[in-house]
Amino acid sequence: MALTELKGQTGGTQRVVIERGPVRVFAEALGDTDDVYQQDEAPVPPTFPFVMSYWGSFGTGGAAGLPIERLRGPGRAILHGEQAFEYHRWPEVGDVLEGTTTITDVYEKERSNGGKLEFYVTETAWRDATTQDPVVTAIFTLVINVRPPQPS
């Protein structure tokens, strides 16, 4: 698949209800034992929006409606590159959010061994489902390590 085929692709809109259980489990997995995550109206941990894009996507071959599985193949490994978050307000338990993910940039770098690295930058804009006010934008870079061709 050519890199240019994916740039600008949008994965559609997904709806997420932030529930206390997943927030608590996520905080515990990070080793964050702050009591604030045990409350009924708890805020989410700072990196929690990353996992929201994957809710409901297991077994679908994608995340947030994007064709992640189409990037896999022989000699290709998917790596987590970078992530960042722009908060407009802090999400919390009870929020119902709608997120739209777009691939905003694609590029590649050649490696000295004949392989290459492909970079896919995505942005997921999460909005309040009722007011449509922006809540958080999650920016994520997916890296595909493409091994060099093997001699036959």
Regions found by a protein language model. Give the residues of each.
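Hot-dog-fold acyl-thioester-processing enzymes
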Residues: 1-82, 149-152
